């Protein structure tokens, strides 16, 4: 009699639910997963090595391209590491701007997650709803940096420039008539802060819409409840952070436990899940969207009341203003040196971590006193989560592998680096 062998199946890297370039070798007993072996490296771009050949400031745009769904949060960890090496004080207004854009980025990430996760499982409508809101937030990115995704807006010592007083307007086109254009531009008639405030007033209603579609949906719960269960002890042992750790019932958030910038001055709650399954992680992330909206509102209120500088006045680190350059030879020299040679960072090492939408994103930077990093190590939050896929998927059906990949919120830019 022939032996009954397990069936080996390749999932990805071209699968639409693979979230990029994941190749998963699955060992199946019928439709039940016995082993899941993730093969990574298909998006490896040697970011850490490239950073060693660029000046400190030239590597800021590389950070955007790591987790390309959470652009500015990646930059934040990198510039914080440089600031620790330099011992730099960041102006308070710049800190509030950074925190506000960190939370806008968290919303961008979570909207992409909820849309793609639901689409993978079979709920198509949420994807279209989520991208409607993402469009407004890309406009916020564009208003401050000129780019809709890869902003390169944060700088060692602050941010590139202050918030603009005007918002880009929609123009007449063949697609929209004048009345539609006028309605679309209504929220854009004021400053960027006005536009963000208007968005924060609208956003809770949008989250309610997602919850109406999903939270009590019978099919959604059947696909997520008791799938990919991770106990609090195992979550800690496997190095989980962010919503993956909080979904297992452990209250750990760097914004509360190791506050950076002005998070200790802001009022928000840390949602914690019960059960450690895919549904618990879904509820945690949905509540995180509401809390991020609260933080953004507080930042808008503070920024309205408190004008001030948005970058350090140390011109060995930050470029002087264009006006000063035209009247002062020394400022012109600073500008020239900064953009040709770059700044020299004192010898030492620093680790800076931020509460990234996916977990703890850390930058470990070593300087030998030169104008380039001696070594740059990136701590990607998604890496330990993907390593746990085998344990989370074992014993589940093959269709549940898609749910588990979705709940991990994986992006390969940061995993492969």
Curated annotation (Swiss-Prot):
GO molecular function term, any single one: quinone binding
Catalysed reactions listed for this entry: a quinone + NADH + 5 H(+)(in) = a quinol + NAD(+) + 4 H(+)(out)
EC number: 7.1.1.-
Keyword field: Cell inner membrane, Cell membrane, Membrane, NAD, Quinone, Translocase, Transport, Ubiquinone
Record's bilayer topology term: Peripheral membrane protein
TM region(s), chain numbering: none
Keyword Iron: no
Localisation per UniProt entry: Cell inner membrane
Top EC category: translocase
Parts forming coiled coils: none
Pfam families named in the record: Complex1_49kDa (PF00346)
CC per GO annotation: plasma membrane
Subunit comment: NDH-1 is composed of 14 different subunits. Subunits NuoB, C, D, E, F, and G constitute the peripheral sector of the complex.
The family this protein is said to belong to: Belongs to the complex I 49 kDa subunit family.
Function of the protein: NDH-1 shuttles electrons from NADH, via FMN and iron-sulfur (Fe-S) centers, to quinones in the respiratory chain. The immediate electron acceptor for the enzyme in this species is believed to be ubiquinone. Couples the redox reaction to proton translocation (for every two electrons transferred, four hydrogen ions are translocated across the cytoplasmic membrane), and thus conserves the redox energy in a proton gradient.
Name of the protein described by the UniProt record: NADH-quinone oxidoreductase subunit D
Organism: Cupriavidus necator (strain ATCC 17699 / DSM 428 / KCTC 22496 / NCIMB 10442 / H16 / Stanier 337)
Source taxonomy: Bacteria, Pseudomonadati, Pseudomonadota, Betaproteobacteria, Burkholderiales
Gene name tied to this protein: nuoD
């Amino acid at each position: 009699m022939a032996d009954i062998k397990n069936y080996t199946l390749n999932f990805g890297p071209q699968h639409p639910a693979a979230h990029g370039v994941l190749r998963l070798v699955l060992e199946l007993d019928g439709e039940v997963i016995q082993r899941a072996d993730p093969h990574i490296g298909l998006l490896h771009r040697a970011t850490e090595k490239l950073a060693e050949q660029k000046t400190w400031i030239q590597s800021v745009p590389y950070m955007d391209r790591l987790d390309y769904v959470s652009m500015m949060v990646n930059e934040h960890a990198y510039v914080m590491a440089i600031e620790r090496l330099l011992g730099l004080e960041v102006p308070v207004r710049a800190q509030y701007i950074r925190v506000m854009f960190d939370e806008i980025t968290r919303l961008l990430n979570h909207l992409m997650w909820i849309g793609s996760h639901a689409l993978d499982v079979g709920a198509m409508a949420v994807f279209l709803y989520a991208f409607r809101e993402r469009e407004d937030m890309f406009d916020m990115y564009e208003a401050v940096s000129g780019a809709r995704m890869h902003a390169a807006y944060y700088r060692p010592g602050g941010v590139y420039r202050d918030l603009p007083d005007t918002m880009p307007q929609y123009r007449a086109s063949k697609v929209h008539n004048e009345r539609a254009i006028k309605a679309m531009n209504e929220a854009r008639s004021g400053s960027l802060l006005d536009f963000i405030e208007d968005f924060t007033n609208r956003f809770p209603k949008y989250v309610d819409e997602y919850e109406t579609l999903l939270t009590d949906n019978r099919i959604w719960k059947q696909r997520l409840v008791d799938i990919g269960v991770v106990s609090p002890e195992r979550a800690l042992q496997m190095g989980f952070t962010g919503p993956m750790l909080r979904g297992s019932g452990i209250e750990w958030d760097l914004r509360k436990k190791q506050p950076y910038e002005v998070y200790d001055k802001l009022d928000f709650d840390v949602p914690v899940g019960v059960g450690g399954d895919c549904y618990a992680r879904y509820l945690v992330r949905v509540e995180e969207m509401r809390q991020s909206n609260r933080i953004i509102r507080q930042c808008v209120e503070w920024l309205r009341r408190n004008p001030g500088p948005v970058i350090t006045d140390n011109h060995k680190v930050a470029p002087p203003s264009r006006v000063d350059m035209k009247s002062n030879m020394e400022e012109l020299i600073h500008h020239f040196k900064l953009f040709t040679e770059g700044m020299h960072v004192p010898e030492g090492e620093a680790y800076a971590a931020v509460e990234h939408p996916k977990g703890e994103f850390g930058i470990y930077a070593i300087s030998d006193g030169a104008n380039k990093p001696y070594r740059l190590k990136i701590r990607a939050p998604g890496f330990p989560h993907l390593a746990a896929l085998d344990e989370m998927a074992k014993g589940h059906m093959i269709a549940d592998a898609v749910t588990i990949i979705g709940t991990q919120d994986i992006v390969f830019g940061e995993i492969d680096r």
